[in-house]
Each structure stands twice: as C-alpha cells, then as structure tokens.
Amino acid sequence: MKLILITTITTIAAVMLVGCATTQPPSPPTAKAPEISIHKAAYQGNIEAVKRHIAAGTDVNTQDDSGWTPLHWAASKVHNKTAKLLIEEGADVNVVNKDGLAPLDYAENQIFGVLIDNGAKSGAELKAEGK
C-alpha cells in the first residue's frame, strides 16, 4: 500500500512539474537589419541590404513620411532586381503615396512590365476604383 501511495505521489508531482513549466518566448529573428533603411536601400538598388531587411523581418510595405514604399523607390530608380525581390516578398504593387501615386506611376520602361505583370495599376486607376 505504501508503495502504491509513494508511486502515486511521485507521479502527481511529476505531472505538476511538467504542467507548471514556463514556456520560452519565441526567439527573435536571427538576422539583424542593416543600418541603412529599407527605403534608402531600395532607392540605391542595394539588393543585399534589402535582403538583410527581409531576413530581419522588416515589412516590405512600410511607408515613409511621404507614403512611399520601398517598391516606389525601386521603381522610380529603375532597380529591376530590387523591385522583383520586393514583389516576390509580398510588396503591394498598388500602394499609393500621399500624392495618390502608385509605384507604376514612377516606373520607367524597363520596370513597367514587371509591375504590370504583377497586377500594378496607376494611381488614377486606383482612385477610380475607390482605393
């Protein structure tokens, strides 16, 4: 009888210890964002810095004080590879800035097709749709 009681108490204690264990908070992203902002990196076509921002969890749709996203900057400076990377990582091709203009409105010929192929519309088209 003593053996059963000791076994039962030991089992209950073990269950309580396991059930009361604290869980570890999720670990932060292992990559660290570079010193340069994602907007400036996109403006400069610094694809490596953009990749590091993405790895660190930076939002590719973040807007600066003028409402420009990194894609606005990449499109305006004809940085095709940077624009493609941003789009592949979820950049919204139809975000409008404070002037009501989308990345497509700033695009040059070389990048125009990339944006159109990914559903981009001009600021005027988006305004007509009520966006």
Task: State where each predicted segment sits.
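Ankyrin repeat A-helix N-terminal signature
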Residues: 40-46, 73-79, 106-110
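C-terminal motif of bacterial Sec signal peptides marking the signal peptidase cleavage site
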Residues: 17-19
